[in-house]
Amino acid sequence: MPQVRVAGNHAPDHELGGPLDTSDPTVGRLDPDLLGALQAAARDAQTDGVRMVVTSGWRSRSHQQRLFAEAVRTYGSEAEARRYVSTPDTSEHVTGDAVDVGPTDADSWLSRHGARYGLCQMYANEVWHYELATTPGGRCPEVLPDASSRR
């Protein structure tokens, strides 16, 4: 298995955890197809000298709610917070359909090669956020300005 590592929630470019371990619910509860695509991409990235870190994967509803509440405090309103953090009802992390990766060289590598695995950057303001949004080798959807644009 490639040197993919799990890190803490939402900390692009800051490694907090150990090796990728599907017994960790942040990884083990990812959609199996997303996880498989991520592992394949990480193997190929490693061949190119890029180590991929998972900074956030599956999140519980309560954790997502805490992140959203913190964003409301930080940005001053729910509308502004939604540009950066989804609610538990709309978060792709809660369903296991999104993963945040780092460090920056891994983000850059996935930006160039992710569609080969079906992995697509979804938001312009979150270069670390990827979802399985196309078939391997397909065309990724247009990148949205931010998470609030999706709703």
Task: Name the predicted role of every residue range.
Residues 1-151:
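Cell-envelope/glycan interface and biosynthesis
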